């Protein structure tokens, strides 16, 4: 239940710009995050080493830059960043983007 997890307010997530609010469940097998990316905010570019990431958009529109491509994930769509690849994401809209991100630990 994400409502039972304390919300973190992060400025410049992974070296990006703006605000990200996150409730994260973390154990030794995965990191599962319920996040709100504010208008104009972005993450920094980062690589998934020893993990991958799946981001599912609950509301809003998330612009994702993955390797050499740009894609827009809308409500009900997801973005997948395989292990070893780079990505960064941003909210190019005037509305919050709410998404669920799952980052398993690969062994």
Predicted regions and their residues:
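Short beta-strand His + acidic residue motifs that chelate non-heme Fe in jelly-roll/DSBH
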Residues: 44-45, 64-65, 81, 87-94
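Structural motif
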Residues: 51, 61-63, 70, 86, ...
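Short, conserved beta-strand element in jelly-roll/cupin
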Residues: 36-38, 47-64, 102
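Short beta-strand segments
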Residues: 33, 43, 69-71
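Short loop/turn positions at the edges of beta-strands in beta-sheet-rich folds
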Residues: 26-29, 39, 49-51, 58, ...
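A short, N-terminal "cap"/entry segment at the start of jelly-roll beta-barrel domains
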Residues: 1-31, 44-45
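A short hydrophobic beta-strand segment most commonly corresponding to one strand
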Residues: 54, 80, 94-107
């Amino acid at each position: 239940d994400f409502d039972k997890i304390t919300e973190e307010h992060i400025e410049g997530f992974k070296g990006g710009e703006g605000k990200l609010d996150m409730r994260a469940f973390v154990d030794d097998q995965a990191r599962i995050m319920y996040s709100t990316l504010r208008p104009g905010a972005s993450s920094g570019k980062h690589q998934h080493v020893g993990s991958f990431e799946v981001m599912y958009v609950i509301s809003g529109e998330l612009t994702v830059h993955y390797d050499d491509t740009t894609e827009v994930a809308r409500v009900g769509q997801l973005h997948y960043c395989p292990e070893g690849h780079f990505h960064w994401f941003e909210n190019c809209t005037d509305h919050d983007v709410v998404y669920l991100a799952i980052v398993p630990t690969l062994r």
